[in-house]
Amino acid sequence: MRCRSVALVWREWKWRGVGDKRQSRLIFLNLPSTLNPDTFRKTLLSPATLKSTTITDTKLVPKRRFAFVGYKDAEEAQKVKEWFDGTYAFGGGKVKVDFVKDEPLKTGDKLNRGEKSKEKRSKEGRDNVQEKQEPNKRLQEFMSVMKGVDPAMASPEASTSTAEGTKKEKSVKGKEKSEEPEEAEADDDDAAWLRRRQAALEGEPSTPQLSADEQLILSTSRLFVRNLAFITTSESLSSHFSTYGRIDECHLPVSQTTGEPLGTAFLQFHNAEDALAAYKALDKTIFQGRLLHVLPGRAKPGQEGAAAGSGVVDGKVLGKRDEGRGEVKSKVDAKRKQESAKGVNWASLYMNSDAVAASVADRMGISKSELLNADSGNSAVKLALAETTVIEETKKYFEEAGIVLESLQPRVPRSQTTILVKNIPYGTSIQSLTDLFAPHGKLTRVLLPPAGTLGVVEFENHMDAGRAFKALAYRRLGNAVLYLEKGPVGMFKSETAPGVGPISTEQKREEEAKALAEKVESLPEQPDPTDEAGSTLFLKGLNFTTTTPHLQTVLSHIPGFSFARVQMKPDPKRPGEKLSMGYGFVGFKTKEAATKALKALEGFEIDGKSLEVKFAQRGAEDDRETKKGGDAEGGKTKSTKVLVKNLPFEATKKDVRELFSAYGQLKSLRLPRKAVPTSTGAQSTRGFAFLEFTTHTEAARAMEALKHTHLLGRHLVLQWANEGEEVDIKGLREKVKGEVRGMEDGGDRKRRKLDFKGGKEDEMDGLEV
């Protein structure tokens, strides 16, 4: 059952403010007193235009003839208000509908108003008492004088008390005199005396005192939110609270029996000040039609009352197993595990090098020592080529399983139910992977390629996926440590999962047929061999909603029609989808038919857009695609030069040549080196290289195959090289030559000026191949 605070319900009944600001919560006034909740809810959903609205909360008070209704967002509430306001839809009188406004923030004056009035009353009371007591003292003094008897002679006790009272009065007068500010000296000016006077009157400013709840928030940076709608997701809640600061974690508990949300959430902020600001601003405000109740959140279980021997590193409590380990290593391990869910820490297709070598060696029927023979001198290249082979097999398997490979990019939104399992040791079976993740929740999909080096696990519930991610991140499996990463959104082509385990043969054939059909559709249609040259028209100004089938249907009635297509490009926001480029081509069997169609189609409207038609130039189509949509393989130009970044400094020219020559013939290879030699006397490489292939196809093949490959543990970053980059390298080389030559010159200052224009070439820089 939904837990609601008694104080929150009473506050909502007591205060019913309305306003002009659009909110997701409405108040209905002047309702019939005989209206029941079921009839009220059915009436709200009865209009056809309001059937799609989502009601998150209803509270009807028939005796007072008003009701509160909450909706998913302000747009839905606006539609309902416009429909029911001023109508007689519920029977009885005219109904008034308005937005419920948030409770105004309490100011300091309102908070202290009661305290100030209380102090004022107490002060007035003390003054009255003193006024009442003063006449009594005078009366006693008058009566003692009028007795005519010496008080000291009549009563020794009275004389003693009188003497003590005199001393006490003198001491009080002396104290009052000492408390008075000293008179200004003669030589002091009026401004100095005024400053001393004001400082004495004002005193020290009082520091604001924090409540216990605020102190708890500042210590934990955590908030507990309740009274949420059941449709609330972690994304929507994080988006609502993230306006006040970065949120590291958003946890929405669900019922263990039904799997339904409980209407509560825990929010972990990165900064404690941001959490306190969100607590003050969003408590008792409206979100998705319900009044939020924000409370301070306690620390996570396991972080409270940490033992004295276990420290806290970056907010993470180190357990007993961290005792005795190095301080630096413990910090690194704790921070890495804590930040594992915040971003992408590894390449999407990262694989264990030992598992790759074992997989390839097992297929070849040899041992790993024979594969990675130290005497051969190219073990790193062999391992990189083996990793490339395994990655190609893995990509092919994932394509057959319905995974969009274009979605495996580092900067894309991450799914809350899909987990990439990396660094798996060789020999791990799909059953062992299922047994590892199944205890944390219901699985809908488990994929493991034949090489067994990378897996994909999908949960039915995002809460189970988050629990498994926290429990299994950096956990040891066999002789390796698991690296987990949240899968990208839109990773699978279809929402329906094929189930746990490998896909069936029938499903595999269906996926292959579907993939083949999509591949055929993506290929440019070739005109009939009998078509004459110059019989293709270029259509410009197409509507971006116009598709190829629709264009074919419209133009197929033209005599001599051969083919028609709309030029498409990949959608960067939705992997696997395509966008129209706004132009297309239509082919005819003869040039005469194309000429007639040119005259007929000029200015013709398709989907509300007027066409611009002209003859297409043979061979110019690819150039036009390259300029507007970009070449999927070659970037902006059909270049044959590749820039390789993130090369390890230990890599030699021989290693790079052997690695890339497996995919094409290299025309040239340049591996720039640093001008200043190292302590050993050798010139270290600068971490990048330029490669030139004989053809663009070979260069594209190498880039596609090696873009996920690691060489000596470093991920190779491949880009198309521009001519300007090589010119910059040459200019930098000449600049370094001039600097060194200027440093070596002796004599006066004029002769030691640096020559940035370069001079006679020498071999000191080692940049030439």
UniProtKB/Swiss-Prot annotation:
GO-annotated biological processes: rRNA processing
Annotated region (Disordered), positions in chain: 105-139, 151-191, 617-637, 740-769
Record localization: Nucleus
GO molecular function: mRNA binding
Amino acid composition bias (Basic and acidic residues), ranges on this chain: 165-178, 619-636
Keywords on record: Nucleus, Repeat, Ribonucleoprotein, RNA-binding, rRNA processing
Cellular component terms (Gene Ontology): nucleus; ribonucleoprotein complex
Start and end residues of each RRM domain: 24-102, 221-299, 417-489, 535-618, 640-723
Compositional bias (Acidic residues): 179-191
Top-level taxonomic group: Eukaryota
General function of this protein: Involved in pre-rRNA processing.
PANTHER family, per the entry: RNA-BINDING MOTIF PROTEIN 14B, RNA-BINDING PROTEIN 28
Sequence similarity: Belongs to the RRM MRD1 family.
Protein name: Multiple RNA-binding domain-containing protein 1
Gene: MRD1
